[in-house]
């Protein structure tokens, strides 16, 4: 078990007559890592809207995974799909969203809301507010006074540079929603951007100078 944990990135030291002590936790986004931070110790139930986490080392798109699961497996409301990297990440209007491994949070939340389709657009705004608050919470805890704001309706900017984009997709009939998928891409520890976007895009690392543990942000969502 100790060797397996070390392979996963944990730094473990042996303490004489006491066993082992974990001195450094890896920046991983596995289902277990995220759920451990979402579960209430007293009740054993999850807090917030996320009920289950499905993790992939790599996928084409977490939005696609969520939609496939919703249609094929009747996946439950509150299921979060998250991956280390996407090969076909996308933003609004079909724009490509670069999603390299180990640098960001690429996730999609599946919802089955009991609301009219005409009101579904508000879910994007609610998601933007939740992401903004999660980023602000983590940065504040780490002593950063960065200016994190929502650029309505679906972008999060830090010091006036885009660090997060949100893509919402829906399957519905005229008066009934089958499901909504809210995809979120957060540039956390990204160190460089393509010349075509580096004037307007950034990451939490570039704006603060600190590498942040990604699972903390997911758990704060």
Located regions from the model:
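N-terminal lobe of the biotin/lipoate ligase/transferase fold
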Residues: 2-140
């Amino acid at each position: 078990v100790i060797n397996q944990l070390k392979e996963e990135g944990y730094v473990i030291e042996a303490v004489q007559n006491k066993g082992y002590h974990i001195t450094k936790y890896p920046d991983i986004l596995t289902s277990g890592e995220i759920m451990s931070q979402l579960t209430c110790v007293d009740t054993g139930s999850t807090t917030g809207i996320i009920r289950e986490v499905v993790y992939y080392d790599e996928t084409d798109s977490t939005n696609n995974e969520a939609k496939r699961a919703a249609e094929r497996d009747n996946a439950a409301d509150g299921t979060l799909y998250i991956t280390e990297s996407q090969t076909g990440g996308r933003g609004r209007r079909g724009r490509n969203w670069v999603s390299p491994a180990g640098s960001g949070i690429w996730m999609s939340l599946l919802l089955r809301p009991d609301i009219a389709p005409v009101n579904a657009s508000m879910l994007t705004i609610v998601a933007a507010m939740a992401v903004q608050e999660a980023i602000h919470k983590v940065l504040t805890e780490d002593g950063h006074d960065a200016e994190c704001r929502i650029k309505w309706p679906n972008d999060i900017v830090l010091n006036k540079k885009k660090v997060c984009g949100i893509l919402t997709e829906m399957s519905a009939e005229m008066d009934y929603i089958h499901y909504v998928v809210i995809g979120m891409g957060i540039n956390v520890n990204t160190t460089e951007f393509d010349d075509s976007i580096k004037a307007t895009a950034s990451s939490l690392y570039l704006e603060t100078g600190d590498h942040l543990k990604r699972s903390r942000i997911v758990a704060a969502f």
